């Protein structure tokens, strides 16, 4: 019966759909439905990818980051606690040594949190997730050329001391000894991210030799909005003691600066400092450094730099573009349709390169206090010894 054929066909189709749980068995049965099914399957696959993989992975990445930052906060809090405790005048020698031990231990932990990883991918190193933030061991032969930018806001006051007491022998103490009081010098400075600098380059890229004076350029905007450039004369010294000798000899010009290689400091004369601050200037220091200690941050995560360890295979890293804008290495996860989430945090945004240097200076200050205390105890002991019982010796010891 021709009239019953469509009914039987419809009935067969419905029976097939019920038994197979599928609207169509083959695309040719209904191309429109087939296309819609494929689109639905694709959308469902994407949603499953978001739900089962991307969102949990992003959440885990953020949790690792949060934990690392919380640990860093705890470490800095512990450092502050040690500093507060060390400010007491009632401390004994053993107490200061305990503080020193604690600070040295905390110093090692500071940037270790920056090496935190999720599933083997370091979370603070941008796209280089297979690399660590810090040097994992001492690398005495590794050498970088670094361009580190500073603004006038990076200028800070620092106190320098000279005239350390050197204990003499009993024979020397029996004679009249001329002693000098400890002197304090207060200067503004710009401190580099590293000490033990190999060489500083002048504005033309040429090395300024130790004991010689070169010229650096600084940049500022005048009252009319025009970009201007100024010159700063800088004399290079190998050590802080060498620079102090120059200061005592009157060789620290008010309108110039001194660069100390061992400490990585640009010490500014008073006039030079005022000029930079009043003009709200910026200055870039171009320097080479060879040899990095375990735990120091790698320059490529903070500055424009070039790994020049192998002269035939130099590796250039760009942290800032030609206009001085930071180049971000964001890792984005797709967590929904047309929705992305940046999961990583750049080390330069949360692990300031100055933190380690600050703690190093604290450690040096504690060591100096311990050394001074030991000398006082030694002098007291010497005063009670027969070898130092003479009038001249007693006067010198006092």
Regions found by a protein language model. Give the residues of each.
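Short flexible/disordered coil segments
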Residues: 83-94, 147-162, 191-209, 321
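Polar, glycine-rich mid-to-C-terminal structural blocks
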Residues: 142-189
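Polar, low-complexity export/assembly segments characteristic of proteins
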Residues: 8-11, 15-18, 22, 137-161, ...
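A generic structural signal for short, non-catalytic loop/turn and secondary-structure boundary residues
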Residues: 117, 185, 209-211, 252, ...
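Extended, beta-strand-rich, solvent-exposed assembly scaffolds of outer structural proteins
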Residues: 182-298
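Amphipathic alpha-helical polymerization modules
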Residues: 1-138, 395-398
